[in-house]
Amino acid sequence: MDRSQVKEIVDREIEPLMKRLGIDHWKVMVSYDPERIDGDGQIKHGECTRLVDYNSAHISLNPESFEDEPGVLKTLRHELFHVVLSPFDLYSSTVDRALDSPGPVREILDRVWTHSCEKAVINLERMFVNMSYAD
């Protein structure tokens, strides 16, 4: 999809979706960055960074990675679920400060953190989809 198509979907859906997820008090900025690759060489659909103390987030979407509207909406929800889980970012940032230097302990904790966060987001997505069918 091109940037304008993805932007149109996001502009239409983000506010109602944030309200449904209980995060409409957050300020979420969205940008569109094509062809971003993750550490494993896979094309990224989206990414979310959060400033939990300020209820502020930035979502970056890769328009070229989407084939259709359901794909855009799934990724948008996924990134917004990271905002829902943002209070746990305090734990992550505290551990980062406590472990000044890189090393095996930090690598293990980073791995556990990433896995736990992504699994929690996937579970929220499943919950959301099942609740939507009940509406």
Segments and roles (model prediction):
Residues 1-70, 87-135:
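Metalloprotease/metallohydrolase-associated module, dominated by Zn2+-dependent proteases
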Residues 74-87:
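Active-site recognition of the HExxH zinc-binding catalytic motif
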